[in-house]
From Swiss-Prot:
The keyword Ribosomal protein does not apply. The gene is AGD14. This is Probable ADP-ribosylation factor GTPase-activating protein AGD14. InterPro entries: AGD14-like, ARFGAP/RecO, ArfGAP_dom, ArfGAP_dom_sf. A zinc finger (C4-type) spans 27-50. Residues 12-130 form the Arf-GAP domain. It comes from Arabidopsis thaliana (Mouse-ear cress).
């Protein structure tokens, strides 16, 4: 380190001495004073401006103050310089006629350097005086070698064998670093054998099975003086002699040469045959290294591979026999295995039939409550499907049939097409809405309806078809009392029920009960066990009202005395809305005739109190309001009439 620094200082002193020489005091290109750069391509002293232009032409330039020169470069520079370069490159240059360019004009300097050093226009024909063709080549080659060494000094990678062994068996011990690459690989392998028997077994098995079809790797048997590394023998019986030839430290002898590696392990002379014959454990014991050496251990391991393969083949059926059904860790011991229930495909002999939510019961093929409609012409099966109806009150069910005590199927067969109508019964008011756990279904064959029943049904349907009259919800006439229509319906009910009861009382029993309720409403109730001759059970009869019931329809009175009274006429005994006392207290004011000229006579009511709604109008919702009707609860008060509902207006 100190020598190189002293050499650099000495070289710099020599170069500065060369700069003081008269030919080197000025730049060779522009003749400027004090050049500070050296063009090592032509070994000339140039100024800073010319050095930049030289770099444009890829000429090498060094700074005297900032760069370091080697001893060779200093020697070549002593033999060269500006004077020597003028003799070579400016030999035909006429100094009286031609002037050197100024450094301020870069174009002329660039043209000068191109003509002199690149095109060599002013060089002489005799090149024998060229100073340093050989010296320049020598310096260039030396410089390239030096730069290559400095570049690869810390980046050289080890040979492939050593690199492979280091990657496979770990770092190499420090004692083996001073040897060649092949010896390093062998010692790395041997050291890995000694330190880790498990890795040795892995290596032995890998060498045994990897060399069956191809040649062994050159890195495994790479020795500088060994035989052919690309042998194709499978078991490699000569591996012991090769190991003896490669490493004299591990020769086959009874004397333990491994004392240097294991200085305190001579007492461990245990013979462990199980460790040699077992595949899972370490392949060799320390005794095999200390007593017999590496070659003996390798031969013993080679001899035991055949028997080991036989033993492992004997153990394979035991493993195959012991393999049973896999144990489910999530299954509790003794817990029954739950079978997966497929709701779309019936299982084979299930313990409990699954509920099919996609197919409706076949006996109720024409039930309108079924949201998943089935086929109309589907025949009833020989065995009815079992349904588990929930025991919840008030819940709607789509697939389950409507609750009924008995159900009947009416079959009308025009040709091959069969239409099944389910006639359900109307529950009594005292019947609860709880569904039975197992609803009764019809038998395999549908019930046959007697002829009178069918005749009544056909007559009713024919009347409906023949008389397609629209339903008039708002009749125009006030006297159109629905009592007559209700009486007609009662007569039809009586006649139909009597005929059906007399014809076949075993299948259908109907009884019409007419009762007068507390509010005077006459209702018709069909008890359980009967049906309304062909009509579905969910069709109820409209209640019929008697003549006395019109008086008690609206018994509720408004709490506001200024509202229009809608009570019936006989409620005038109630003094809450009676205006007779108020009207009697008011003075009798006669309206002048002048105020009555533009008013028609119907607007002058005989009563100051607004008229009441009649009973039929009240029953019909108050739609037909007759303003011209006068009440008889008070005497006439003359032609005076209050047009508003407020008596104080």
């Amino acid at each position: 380190m100190m020598g190189s620094k002293r050499e650099e200082e000495r070289n710099e002193k020599i170069i500065r001495g060369l700069m003081k020489l008269p030919p080197n005091r000025r730049c060779i290109n522009c003749n400027s004073l004090g050049p500070q750069y050296v063009c090592t391509t032509f070994w000339t002293f140039v100024c800073m401006a010319c050095s930049g232009i030289h770099r444009e032409f890829t000429h090498r330039v060094k700074s005297v103050s900032m760069s370091k020169f080697t001893s060779k470069e200093v020697e070549v520079l002593q033999n060269g310089g500006n004077q020597r370069a003028r003799e070579i490159y400016l030999k035909n240059w006429d100094h009286q006629r031609q002037r050197l360019p100024e450094n301020s004009n870069a174009e002329r300097v660039r043209e000068f350097i191109k003509n002199v050093y690149v095109q060599k226009k002013y060089a002489g024909a005799n090149d024998a005086d060229k100073p340093s063709k050989d010296s320049q080549d020598h310096v260039s080659s030396e410089d390239m070698t030096r730069r290559a060494n400095s570049y690869h000094s810390y980046s050289q990678s080890p040979p492939y064998d050593y690199q492979y062994e280091e990657r496979r068996y770990g770092k190499i011990p420090l004692g083996f670093t001073g040897k060649s690459a092949s010896v390093k690989g062998l010692h790395a392998k041997a050291s890995s054998f000694v330190y880790s028997p498990g890795r040795f077994s892995d290596h032995m098995f890998e060498d045994q099975f990897s060399n069956e079809d191809s040649a062994p790797r050159a890195s495994d048997y790479s020795v500088s003086s060994a035989g052919d590394p690309f042998r194709s023998d499978i078991q490699s019986p000569n591996f012991q002699q090769e190991a003896e030839f490669r490493s004299p430290q591990f020769q086959h002898s009874n004397a333990p040469p491994s004392e240097n590696l294991f200085p305190g392990r001579q007492h461990q002379r245990t013979t462990s045959s199980g460790s040699v014959r077992s595949v899972d454990s370490n392949f060799m014991s320390i005794k095999s290294y200390t007593s017999g050496g590496l070659g003996e251990a390798v031969s013993e391991s080679r001899q035991n591979t055949g028997s080991q393969q036989g033993k492992t083949s004997n153990h394979v059926p035991l493993v195959a026999e012991s393999t049973k059904a896999p144990i489910d860790l999530f299954q509790l011991p003794g817990a029954p295995v739950a079978q997966s229930v497929d709701t779309f495909q019936p299982s084979i002999a299930p313990r409990s039939p699954p509920v099919n939510l996609q197919q409706a019961p076949q006996t109720y093929s024409f039930t309108p409550a079924n949201s998943f409609a089935g086929n109309l012409g589907q025949q009833p099966t020989s065995r009815p499907s079992e349904l588990s109806a929930p025991k919840n009150e008030g819940w709607a069910s789509f697939d389950n049939p409507m609750p009924a005590a008995k159900s009947t199927n009416v079959i009308t067969s025009p040709g091959d097409f069969q239409l099944e109508l389910k006639i359900e019964e109307i529950l009594q008011p005292s019947t609860s809405m709880q569904l039975p756990p197992y609803p009764s279904t019809v038998d395999q064959h549908a019930l046959s309806i007697p002829s009178p029943w069918q005749e009544d049904l056909s007559n009713v349907l024919k009347d409906v078809v023949d008389n397609p009259q629209p339903w008039n919800a708002f009749p125009d006439s006030i006297e159109a009392n629905p009592l007559d229509s209700s009486r007609n319906i009662h007569q039809q009910v009586d006649g139909a029920s009597t005929s059906s009861y007399n014809t076949d009382h075993q299948h259908l029993e109907s009884q019409v009960l007419e009762e007068l309720s507390n509010d005077g409403t006459q209702t018709t109730r069909i008890p359980a066990g009967s049906s309304a001759f062909g009509f579905p059970g969910n069709i109820g009869m409209a209640p019929s009202y008697s003549e006395e019931a019109w008086q008690h329809v609206n018994e509720q009175k408004s709490a506001n005395p200024f509202d229009l009274p809608y009570d019936s006429e006989f409620d005038s005994n109630d003094m809450f809305l009676d205006m007779s006392s108020l009207q009697g207290a008011l003075p009798d004011i006669q309206t002048p005739q002048a105020f009555l000229n533009g008013v028609s006579q119907p607007w002058l009511a005989a009563d100051s109190v607004p008229s009441y709604l009649p009973a039929p109008a009240v029953a019909q919702g108050g739609l037909a309001y007759m303003a011209g009707q006068a009440s008889t609860n008070s005497a006439a008060q003359g032609p005076v009439a209050f047009t508003g509902g407020n008596p104080f207006a």
